[in-house]
Amino acid sequence: MTQPIVRSIPLHVVSNDHPSSSPLQPGVKQSGEDKIGRSPVQFADVPVLRKPSWIRVRIPSGNAVQSLKAKLRENRLVTVCEEAACPNIHECFSHGTATFMILGEVCTRRCSFCDVAHGRPKPPDPEEPISLARTVAEMGLKYVVVTSVDRDDLRDGGAQHFVDCIAAIRQSAPQTRIEILTPDFRGKGRMDRALDILAACPPDVFNHNVETVPALYPNVRPGADYQWSLTLLKRFKAQHPQVPTKSGIMLGLGETLDQVQATLRDLRAHDVDMVTVGQYLQPTSHHHPVLRYWTPDEYKALEEYGMALGFSHVASGPMVRSSYHADHQAKEAGLGFNATVSLGSPAVSSTEHRERHTIASKSASKTESIPHR
């Protein structure tokens, strides 16, 4: 009988001290084994699960993906789609949409699920807001998502840079709706400073992902705090009741149904309007393994459960990600705007956008699987 392949699963947090490790140089990326090897987590072996048939994505033909990548490189911009190895990158890029990642490509955290590189970040690029705004205007985007790495090295966690980007986009593309997907701004006084700064120029949608159930935080999000994230969402909503708030969780990391439902209740109790629920996929063999693949029927049941709690929109499915069809999610939640447009094309209608989503979903079981964080 063939022995099952085994991988490691985090068990508990250990010391952050790594006396044998050389100091990190600013801007140097640590990825895969180098990144997880410095993580304050111990491991135990578990079998590797085979991907089920529903973990599939559509890979469109044509050169739209390369065209968009070229435009991003031309403007020295980064997308989380590329840095986090998102499985939906081909579909989104082929439609001319992307989630821009500001404040560099190096994160100060070492989350065991995430494929973004760890290290000591460089100082924020003061030209980035202008470059981002110019690209958004050139692409004719009507909806844009802006996210960032964690910047625990900055007193405001990067909040001022977010505001600079929002202001620049509104100057160059006043019709564009802006969703920001922020880090947790954890640290003494950092949340207060960040919220004060964001109050000067709030986004159209505020998104912060809790990522997983609280019991798994020590293994999945070392350095983060579940209640802190909930408080950030609630405080922002209290300051800006007219701005929709949003959060997301991944499944397959060892959580139970009861824990997921409790997390959804917590989010709603903290005045979160929209929620995304999707399957975690291991980006490399060095990251947290997948412990379970939730079925499409289970995702559908969670969508119904969430809507019954009072969320204005619940996107729940194996390939759902926080920024995937974010414009559609916001529209369903009542935020009025024209649909996102493709690179160099006229605006698509809401009906056409919905049809594209339906076609992609129907094609999912026939196409190649791409790993994701």
Curated annotation (Swiss-Prot):
Residues 12-36, 346-373 are annotated as: Disordered. One of its GO terms (cellular component) is cytoplasm. Pfam families: LIAS_N (PF16881), Radical_SAM (PF04055). Residues 360-373 have a biased composition (Polar residues). It is found in: Cytoplasm. Keywords: 4Fe-4S, Cytoplasm, Iron, Iron-sulfur, Metal-binding, S-adenosyl-L-methionine, Transferase. SUPFAM superfamilies: Radical SAM enzymes (SSF102114). Its EC number is 2.8.1.8. Belongs to the radical SAM superfamily. Lipoyl synthase family. NCBIfam families: lipA, PRK05481.1, PRK12928.1. This is Lipoyl synthase. It comes from Xylella fastidiosa (strain M12). The gene is lipA.
